[in-house]
Structure formats: C-alpha cells, structure tokens
Amino acid sequence: MYINILKNNTSYRILASDIKYVKILCENIVIKTKNKIYKVRCDSTNLIKKLKIYGFVNSSENCIINLKYVKYINKLYIHFIDGDAILLTYDKYKEIIKIIKPKD
C-alpha cells in the first residue's frame, strides 16, 4: 500500500512499509522513512487510520510507529534498528508491550 502526500505542489507516493514513524507537530506532519524525511501538511486523521491497518501503533498522542523497525523499547524511548530513538509515553509503553510480547 502506498500513501500519497502533497508537498510544495509536488505529489509523493510513499510505500507504507518504508515508513518508520509519523509525528504530528501542530499542523505539520513529519514522515520518517528508511531513506528520507518528509515534512508536510495533510489530514493526519486519515493518514493514521490508513497506517493502523498495516500494523502501526501509537507511541504517544502525536506519534505513530511501524513496529517492524523497532529494535527495542524501554519505558522512556523506542529505539529503532538504525539508531534513531523517539519518546514513549508510559501509557503507550504498556499498550505496546502487550502487542509485542507473546502471551504464554
């Protein structure tokens, strides 16, 4: 699945599986992929709904992550395979741990 975004009158088509995380900063959205960072303005609600279908989860109220790029999680940060790290809220930490830890 591809996500279509518009930036400076140029349309970009991003493969959803290439997206590591999406941060919502006021009216701006930062989309971090394996190779690039996009800073755009678009409807974050629809974008988040689309990405959740593909296994993305919220790490805070303003950030959604792709678990396939996560190396490890502690109570404060999510650490990605490439060395990036983003803040994690405690409530979301508990939710994500339930998702990634298999039940006995």
What do the PLM-derived regions correspond to, one by one?
Residues 1-104:
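Basic, polyanion-interacting recognition surfaces, primarily
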